[in-house]
């Protein structure tokens, strides 16, 4: 009996050693370009996939370069969800694909009603002449969510029902954001605002606003352009100057001082997309938060 127990213990020790030395299964990884896309993807995949984001908090997506660690993870990723028109995407997506031949790239702006640059801010031209900031629109966000879900169903069809069920919940959340923002902005008398980087074109279109960009041709404004913005703000009785947290606040403060308007810091690239959309509406409507 004693010999049997010793043998059993020995086998147990050997098995434990074998399993502890075995390679753990890797996380199932997908990548997204920016944090708002990560929010949507997290809602759809739950904890079944690890969602990595390329552009970290507080960094602009126009000229970002992925880190070596990100490139390693991209080599293990199953899918990449892009906006399709961000500066760094144009420079890096082909490199991502060459790093990982099995990487499937999904463009989340597919079937979104895109804004051509000359429609709203001709002085700021992005690549391919398209305003890429589609996530600033709750209406476009519905299509973004659908595109992410469709991509997940394609790469993981066995879990299609799970993804579609989560999509329904996410769409309900997006609709609630849309309703809240509509209510907050319904009676705002002045439908114009100044913004440093024109990231709210789709938001402005959805809710009947006009955005005036401080940036000129994607660069820090010249004194001449700054004066033009100031004169427009004065003549249009514009009350707010919006600036994203990743940009220098100095030029926004100059305009605010000259026009008597108020500087408002926003973060449309933040992960918590619903809160950011509602916060922007609250600030534009002067509703206490």
PLM regions and their residue ranges:
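Positively charged n-region of N-terminal signal peptides that target proteins for export
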Residues: 1-4
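Short amphipathic alpha-helical "recognition" segments used for binding
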Residues: 6-7, 248
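Bacterial N-terminal signal peptides
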Residues: 7-16
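Extracytoplasmic metal-acquisition and chelation regions
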Residues: 17-289
